[in-house]
Regions:
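C-terminal functional module detector
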Residues: 144-176
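His/Asp/Glu-rich metal-coordinating catalytic cores
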Residues: 1-134, 138-151, 156
């Protein structure tokens, strides 16, 4: 219901803990028209002409996605539009079981901004080629395995890149 009241567009890229399957809430629930859920393990582009942008995404369709080619099909033309992507992926290890990707692969996409999920810690705002990318982390730590400042990213994204800033949000802070 909250997403139905939201006046914008929402996109969801299911990850390894909430992967897309016929039995998942993503498939079984009725979602508002302003919500797009990526259901394919391969990147898909959703055109948003009224917003002047294209939004890419891919879903986990199993608890593990070890294929490291998630970004090879993503090549954004220099067409004056903003090209965004939401992706649950792992930058930390080339042999990861959780959709391994590299900064070099990110740089080849031509995306304006890549919003990453998987790591629950803010990565800093990073750049590869013309693409800005980041893990925002999680808005609220859940235990002593999620230490440090938690929050979200806020900013502006356009055809030439993104200007993002971390906004602290958590009410609780876990520290050792």
């Amino acid at each position: 219901r909250s997403l139905a009241r939201f006046r914008g567009h929402a996109v969801i890229a299911p990850g390894n803990h909430d992967f897309y399957a016929a039995s998942s809430p993503y498939a079984r629930l009725l979602w508002p028209e302003n919500v797009h859920i990526f259901t394919s393990g391969r990147p898909v582009c959703v055109d948003e002409p009224e917003l002047g942008c294209a939004v890419w995404g891919a879903a986990f369709t199993a608890a593990e996605e070890a294929d490291g080619s998630a970004l090879t099909a993503v090549r954004c033309p220099d067409d004056g539009r903003t090209h965004l992507m939401v992706l649950h992926a792992d930058l930390s290890a080339p042999d990861s079981r959780y959709r391994p990707i590299t900064p070099a692969q990110i740089g080849e996409t031509g995306l304006s901004y890549l919003a990453l999920g998987h790591t629950h810690a803010f990565s800093g705002v990073l750049h590869a080629g013309r693409t800005t990318f980041a893990y925002p982390g999680c808005p609220e730590g859940r235990g002593f395995d999620e230490l440090g400042e938690k929050g979200f990213l806020f900013g502006e994204v356009g055809p030439d890149g993104a200007d993002m800033a971390f906004v602290p949000f958590a009410r609780r802070h876990y520290q050792i």
